[in-house]
Amino acid sequence: MDSLRFLRILLLSSSILLLSLRSTVTAGDIVHQDNLAPKKPGCENDFVLVKVQTWIDGVENEEFVGVGARFGKRIVSKEKNANQTHLVFANPRDSCTPLKNKLSGDVVIVERGNCRFTAKANNAEAAGASALLIINNQKELYKMVCEPDETDLDIQIPAVMLPQDAGASLQKMLANSSKVSAQLYSPRRPAVDVAEVFLWLMAIGTILCASYWSAWSAREAAIEHDKLLKDAIDEIPNTNDGGSGVVEINSISAIFFVVLASGFLVILYKLMSYWFVELLVVVFCIGGVEGLQTCLVALLSRWFQRAADTYVKVPFLGPISYLTLAVSPFCIVFAVLWAVYRVHSFAWIGQDVLGIALIITVLQIVHVPNLKVGTVLLSCAFLYDIFWVFVSKKLFHESVMIVVARGDKSGEDGIPMLLKIPRMFDPWGGYSIIGFGDILLPGLLIAFALRYDWLANKTLRTGYFIWAMVAYGLGLLITYVALNLMDGHGQPALLYIVPFTLGTMLTLARKRDDLWILWTKGEPERACPHHVRLEQCSEK
């Protein structure tokens, strides 16, 4: 097996892996719903994340994040409207019986357990507390709900649950100082963040670059093919075989592609852990190195053509150009540095560079041969996205796609198979993210459109590429609108992108009477150079 074929197989394997995660989500939803905890009078709050800012002796100290209860007074959203109130521990600590300490508008801290949450809140309110902080007995947060048989739900103080480590920190503060105060508020996310604009431009730019590279290569191959025909060469190299470095998928492989992605998604969901994410990081680094190397070699070969055309035989890999040997160490070091520092705030830059390079390279290698295959692939992916974001909740009691995207149970901030940008003006921080498949799958169809336009000598207006790009941009824009309307809950991007992109291509093709040739052949009819030469000879 030569190095080129090995590279292609490696990249295809990576692309299958990456396609298993596609939902566009934001890290850390601040508003949560729970169908297992239905609302009723006096117990109808949304589960919102709450910031608990502390002060010691008037000096600002640690900030904790908790979750508001289904019952009680709603928590203010603006920091300026939140009062800075004295903190005390309840006596008894569980607040399951009337409190012995009399409070005057203090925020009381209680421990979870021994009685219902509403009983703790009623006892705290009766003692004069202005708010209730319940410390969980685990590191995770827990949604505080009302029991089905509860009727006394007229609770007029807010209740917030904090994780176990926050409780330990608060206990240490109160042990060292008697002047500890806190401020409770739940700021809202902005309707639109600049990060979403940049992410939109990043997705558009990635498909644009990949499409032009793919179309340029296809046109060069077509010109070379015609030249060989004109020279009357008996054996014309087949540009569709493995020697060209291009892999064309068919309808069967498109369906199998999505089935395999579903299987891998379930494996991710079931085996998600720290060590499994480490394995994904290694796989991502391998694919990222190959992608970055391919892009850099293609770019630099215009200035260093001699180094790009001179090869040396490397054991186990076969012939490799000097330019590839020069670029490879940089790519490897870049990926290793990202892997080492990936938990730092600046690591998203390296992740996006590796991800974009990998997507562009896969779009250069994998081709959709016609509109029929593109329709099958995107239709299957459309159903796949809807199933694993929405329908999977019925089977697994949570959205499998979103759980995998967030990297739950992994101890890390999501898996690396996505592009992300920090939310710049969001008080909660986090990232706006988009799965590789939301770029890669529509990109296959859009790149096909540009290849057809160039081979058919169509202009931007009379071609299909520009309209497919506009449709993709609108579909992705609608995705972000839906994301914000749903309070940041994960949205299957292909639910909006596929109808826009595929619908535009099919409608235009039918209107222009190109549907049959796009659906079956995928390239325009071209005159045979031999026929042209024979006609010229007969005229003499």
UniProtKB/Swiss-Prot annotation:
UniProt-listed GO biological process terms: proteolysis
Signal peptide start-end: 1-27
Matches recorded under Gene3D superfamilies: 3.50.30.30
Locus of motif PAL: 492-494
GO MF: aspartic endopeptidase activity, intramembrane cleaving
Protein's cellular compartments: Endosome membrane
EC number: 3.4.23.-
Pfam family, one: PA
Enzyme active site: D385, D438
Every PA domain range: 95-173
Keyword Phosphoprotein (UniProt): no
Stretches assigned to the Lumenal side: 28-196, 270-278, 341-345, 392-429, 484-488
Highest taxon of source: Eukaryota
Tissue expression: Ubiquitous.
Membrane topology label: Multi-pass membrane protein
Function of the protein: Intramembrane-cleaving aspartic protease (I-CLiP) that cleaves type II membrane signal peptides in the hydrophobic plane of the membrane.
Domain description: The PAL motif is required for normal active site conformation.
Name used for this protein in its record: Signal peptide peptidase-like 2
Highest classification ranks of the organism: Eukaryota, Viridiplantae, Streptophyta, Embryophyta, Tracheophyta
Encoding gene per record: SPPL2
